[in-house]
Amino acid sequence: MSRALLFFVLAILALSAEARGPRVTDKVFFDMEIGGRPVGKIVIGLFGEVVPKTVKNFVELAQRAEGEGYVGSKFHRVIENFMIQGGDFTRGDGTGGRSIYGERFEDENFKLQHYGPGWLSMANAGEDTNGSQFFITTAKTSWLDGKHVVFGKILEGMDVVREIEATPKGAGDRPIEDVVIANAGHIPVENPFTVARAGVN
């Protein structure tokens, strides 16, 4: 095989891998409750090869005790046809939270986009202000591309995300009944696998 042909084949393979999407290297689960009622489990695939620092932050916070991470924290902001937001384990209202690296850490990169419903992204208050807060999209949110770091995708439990999305809200888009992460944890992935750059039904 000529050098030029080999280069062409390798380029096509690289483009094909890119089109297939990022590889899931870790999983995190959330056991969800609404108003004290169990509503199911959300399993999220995380992209540790693309955004390792962001993924490490999320995985560690999912394994910490209540009050120190995601266990016991709430989804405090829910907007239909947009997203559900949580991860503020210090104040519970969107003004708190912190990362494993300190209060805030920088935007790692914007290699991934908000391709549709079911993508996991870091909430922030502007450039390089990532802490522990995150959101899960319930629609395609292209206007957030390049502003929020995407680092995961829902693998199981999109029906639970939709149930949270549909829960009645009060002032400030806050659910009237508490939407709580009753339990959370890390699921190791022995063989990383790719996911499509598409929304979750």
Curated annotation (Swiss-Prot):
Domain of life: Eukaryota
GO terms for biological process, alphabetical: protein folding
EC number: 5.2.1.8
Isomerase found in the keyword field: yes
Enzyme class, first EC level, given as a word: isomerase
GO cellular component, one term: intracellular membrane-bounded organelle
Signal peptide: 1-16
PROSITE patterns: CSA_PPIASE_1 (PS00170), CSA_PPIASE_2 (PS50072)
Reaction equations catalysed: [protein]-peptidylproline (omega=180) = [protein]-peptidylproline (omega=0)
Glycan-bearing residues: N130
UniProt-listed SUPFAM superfamilies: Cyclophilin-like (SSF50891)
Alphabetically ordered keywords of this record: Glycoprotein, Isomerase, Rotamase, Signal
An example molecular function term from Gene Ontology annotations: peptidyl-prolyl cis-trans isomerase activity
Listed Gene3D superfamilies: Cyclophilin-like
UniProt xrefs under Pfam families: Pro_isomerase (PF00160)
PANTHER family: PEPTIDYL-PROLYL CIS-TRANS ISOMERASE, PEPTIDYL-PROLYL CIS-TRANS ISOMERASE 6
Family named by the database record: Belongs to the cyclophilin-type PPIase family.
Function: PPIases accelerate the folding of proteins. It catalyzes the cis-trans isomerization of proline imidic peptide bonds in oligopeptides.
Protein's UniProt name: Peptidyl-prolyl cis-trans isomerase 6
Organism from which the protein derives: Caenorhabditis elegans
Chain's gene name: cyn-6
